[in-house]
């Protein structure tokens, strides 16, 4: 399979050195991400396109390559093509017939040709000749330039002909690694996950910073969704997941700060802590998922006060986005189900919160706060490479594993729905339920507690993590299923 990758149009208007830098970075990213699927993948570059070629023929691998390219920042679109040496016009017609002859009968079609190099013909010459010949030779109903049923696409570059099979849309944006780094404040809900995606889509590397207000289950949930976002949209780069224990900070706020100002003060403490983490990582920009007036702490006066707690630039990609649009985008990018089952704490600690807090009052409330508690939280912060975050969590967990399931036991397949659909788990004589990992903790309590449940995932890592959490919650009827 051969693919021609078209770069983000804004890259093509850069100066030659910058353009070259961005395209080189994109090629590097493509190799990094596709190497897992094909160790011998070939990526070549020209001025405004990249060519990707694999010799593998497994349909699942080829689909995996297309899926990963469609989720990679820096790519406007990519074409699946068949390459031939350029012959005369009749040879071009013959090559097009190989791919379109069965599709043309009875259709209104057009021909589109893009050309680069020196030739004694124009792109329009090719379109006219090939179109007329295909109409006569393939039984097409006619030629329609404005709204054709089918478009015969090709590209000619120097002495090479590319007949286009299909065109796939990319993410756009700049390639990760070519622009600056950011630190995204993650709660795991709809807003923060979509904000992280928007930043990555534009081409900015996103490290993840989580303030743990809700214990182990909340931390695990945020780690899972952060890993999902990174793996799907940003795995060409290695980034960090930072977890800051914020329970004691929250407790100090609840004890010392007036109820109406708790939300603003909590957000200011988070920005102070995030700034300290960013300094440690040499990052100049913070990212949050806040939108104007979505909650009381997000009015313009309050956002201004919150930003005053840091010297860092604070980006809010969703600042003017409606909530339903955020939810729709979360559904599109795959984070909505994570968010629906994620505990949320920030919005419930204030009663009658101030929507127009005053600086002097906020500073007065913060004078009651023991800043040593914030410093202690930062000292206990954990930094883990995002690609190891799930493995590190499960490393010291001792959970009973079984290699065979017995009649009467229930296997719960906790893999992502995509994996469940692609490779359904089948164990003869044993009941199997599908319950994705991000919904397991919230739905497990509704299951029959007289049954014994075996959690299953591909590598056993996620199943061990969730089994450990369920056992710690008092559910003694949980094991891990690891078939031999």
Swiss-Prot record:
Annotated disulfide bonds: 346-457
Main location, first listed in the record: cytoplasm
Residues reported to bind ATP: 185-186, 267, 289, 298
Gene Ontology molecular function, alphabetical: ATP binding; CCA tRNA nucleotidyltransferase activity; tRNA binding; tRNA-uracil-4 sulfurtransferase activity
Active site: 457 (cysteine persulfide intermediate)
HAMAP family, alphabetized: ThiI
UniProt cross-references to NCBIfam families, sorted A to Z: ThiI_C_thiazole, tRNA uracil 4-sulfurtransferase ThiI
Family statement: Belongs to the ThiI family.
Protein known as: tRNA sulfurtransferase
Taxonomic path: Bacteria, Pseudomonadati, Pseudomonadota, Gammaproteobacteria, Pseudomonadales
Encoding gene (name): thiI
């Amino acid at each position: 399979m051969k693919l021609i990758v078209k770069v983000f149009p804004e890259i093509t208007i850069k100066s030659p050195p910058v353009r070259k830098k961005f395209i080189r970075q994109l090629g590097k990213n493509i190799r990094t991400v596709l190497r897992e699927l094909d160790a011998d993948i070939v990526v070549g570059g020209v001025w405004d396109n990249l060519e990707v070629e694999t010799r593998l023929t497994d349909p699942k691998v080829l689909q995996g390559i297309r899926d990963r390219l469609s989720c990679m920042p820096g790519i406007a679109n990519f074409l699946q093509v068949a390459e031939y040496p350029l012959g005369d016009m009749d040879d071009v017609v013959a090559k097009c017939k190989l791919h379109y002859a069965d599709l043309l009968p009875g259709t209104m079609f057009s021909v589109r040709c893009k050309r680069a190099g020196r030739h004694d013909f124009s792109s329009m010459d090719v379109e006219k000749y090939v179109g007329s010949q295909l109409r006569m030779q393939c039984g097409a109903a006619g030629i329609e330039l404005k709204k054709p049923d089918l478009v015969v696409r090709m590209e000619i570059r120097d002495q090479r002909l590319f007949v286009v099979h299909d065109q796939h849309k990319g993410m756009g944006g700049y390639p990760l690694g070519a622009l600056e780094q950011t630190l995204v404040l993650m709660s795991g809900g709809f807003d923060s996950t979509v904000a992280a995606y928007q930043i990555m889509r534009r081409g900015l590397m996103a490290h993840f910073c989580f303030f743990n207000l809700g214990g182990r289950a909340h931390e695990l949930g945020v780690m899972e969704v952060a890993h999902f976002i990174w793996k799907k949209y940003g795995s060409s780069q290695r980034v960090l997941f930072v977890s800051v224990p914020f329970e004691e900070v929250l407790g100090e706020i609840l004890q010392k700060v007036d109820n109406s100002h708790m939300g603003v003060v909590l957000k200011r403490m988070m920005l102070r802590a995030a700034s300290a983490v960013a300094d440690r990582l040499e990052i100049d920009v913070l990212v949050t998922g806040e939108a104007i007036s979505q909650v009381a702490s997000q009015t313009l006066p309050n956002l201004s006060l919150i930003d005053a707690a840091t010297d860092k630039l604070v980006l809010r990609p969703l600042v003017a986005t409606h909530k339903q649009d955020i939810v729709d985008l979360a559904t599109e990018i795959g984070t909505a189900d994570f968010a629906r089952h994620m505990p949320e704490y920030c919005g419930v600690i204030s009663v009658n919160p101030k929507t127009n807090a005053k600086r002097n009052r906020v500073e007065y409330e913060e004078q009651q706060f023991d800043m040593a508690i914030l410093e202690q939280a930062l000292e206990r912060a954990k930094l883990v490479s995002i690609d190891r975050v799930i493995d590190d969590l499960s490393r010291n967990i001792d959970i009973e594993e079984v290699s065979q399931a017995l009649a009467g036991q229930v296997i719960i397949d906790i893999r992502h729905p995509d994996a469940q659909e692609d490779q359904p788990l089948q164990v003869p004589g044993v009941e199997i339920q599908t319950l994705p990992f991000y919904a397991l903790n919230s739905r497990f309590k509704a299951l029959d507690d007289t049954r014994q449940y075996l959690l299953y995932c591909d590598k056993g890592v996620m199943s061990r993590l969730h089994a450990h959490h369920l056992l710690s919650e008092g559910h003694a009827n949980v094991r891990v299923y690891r078939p031999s």
